[in-house]
Amino acid sequence: MKTLALQLQGYLDHLTIERGVAANTLSSYRRDLRRYSKHLEERGITDLAKVGEHDVSEFLVALRRGDPDSGTAALSAVSAARALIAVRGLHRFAAAEGLAELDVARAVRPPTPSRRLPKSLTIDEVLSLLEGAGGDKPSDGPLTLRNRAVLELLYSTGARISEAVGLDLDDIDTHARSVLLRGKGGKQRLVPVGRPAVHALDAYLVRGRPDLARRGRGTAAIFLNARGGRLSRQSAWQVLQDAAERAGITAGVSPHMLRHSFATHLLEGGADVRVVQELLGHASVTTTQIYTLVTVHALREVWAGAHPRAR
């Protein structure tokens, strides 16, 4: 194995063993660093000790530009900034371990992303989406019951899709109407669950899950696929897409849009931004405050259309 490949693997091992980085995050780092490794090798660099600050800066430029010849798409500012985080971590590790004399990525600044407001659904659209999933008839099968429970839980708790499909049976208490979510970095938070979501979960756990569980090997996962294994993020995404299509919602709907809707509707209902921060599992209230801009934007539109001196 080449020196550069060994150095990259050493950093990934460090993230796994010593830092306990989540599997999804590790997968993203591996993908970004593979791209960085290719960038360096194309310049004849096979050792981190030979990398200069300009090599890192040029990598960032290449990410934003893309490469039509190789079919590599240009990355957004957000995606490029994420890739730079992985590269910075690599060079910080290299300097600390004596693999390189200096941390050459330290001074490279990430691109500034445009401040786009997160898209959310209206309350009526969410209700149509949930009803489109079915699960409210005695004749509904186990997969329909599961689909309704997944969507109700996502909207009721604001959970990330990975948090929802990662739930085990011990993580939810339908009597106390609460669920234990495991977020980024292994951080846990106890979140209340609304009554409609509890009803959907009870229906699935009693009438749906046992049938699915008999097809599998005894996993503790709450949400099971048709073969009795843990439901994947991709399959949960498809559940949402199918429900949106049945509800006649033409705009692209993603699991994160339900999370955005959860936060926006809470703030519109008068919830304190720091409470929403805790419910979402954000490390900083600054991340949550983007949703306050959504509600202010909606108020501004109403004001502009109704106030005689708005124009």
Swiss-Prot record:
Gene3D superfamilies, per database record: 1.10.150.130, Intergrase catalytic core
Q: What's the family?
A: Belongs to the 'phage' integrase family. XerD subfamily.
Which keywords, in A-to-Z order, does the entry hold?
Answer: Cell cycle, Cell division, Chromosome partition, Cytoplasm, DNA integration, DNA recombination, DNA-binding
Q: What is this protein called?
A: Tyrosine recombinase XerD
Gene Ontology molecular functions: DNA binding; tyrosine-based site-specific recombinase activity
**Could you state one GO biological process linked to this protein?**
DNA recombination
Looking up NCBIfam families in the UniProt record yields: PRK00283.1, recomb_XerD
Catalytic-site annotation from UniProt? R160, K184, H256, R259, H282, Y291 (o-(3'-phospho-dna)-tyrosine intermediate)
**Listed InterPro entries:** CB, DNA_brk_join_enz, Integrase-like_cat_sf, Integrase_catalytic, Integrase_recombinase_N, Integrase_SAM-like_N, Recomb_XerD, Tyrosine_recombinase_XerC/XerD
Other facts noted in the record for this chain = Was identified as a high-confidence drug target.
Cross-referenced PROSITE patterns, in alphabetical order? Answer: CB (PS51900), TYR_RECOMBINASE (PS51898)
What are the Core-binding (CB) domain coordinates in residue numbering?
A: 2-95
* Annotated compartments: Cytoplasm
Checking CDD domains in the record gives: INT_XerDC_C (cd00798)
Q: What does this protein do?
A: Site-specific tyrosine recombinase, which acts by catalyzing the cutting and rejoining of the recombining DNA molecules. The XerC-XerD complex is essential to convert dimers of the bacterial chromosome into monomers to permit their segregation at cell division. It also contributes to the segregational stability of plasmids.
Residues spanning the membrane: none
Subunit (UniProt): Forms a cyclic heterotetrameric complex composed of two molecules of XerC and two molecules of XerD. Co-immunoprecipitates with DarG in the presence and absence of darT.
Question: Under the cellular component aspect of Gene Ontology, which terms does the record hold?
Answer: cytoplasm; Holliday junction resolvase complex
Question: Tyr recombinase domain spans which residues?
Answer: 116-304
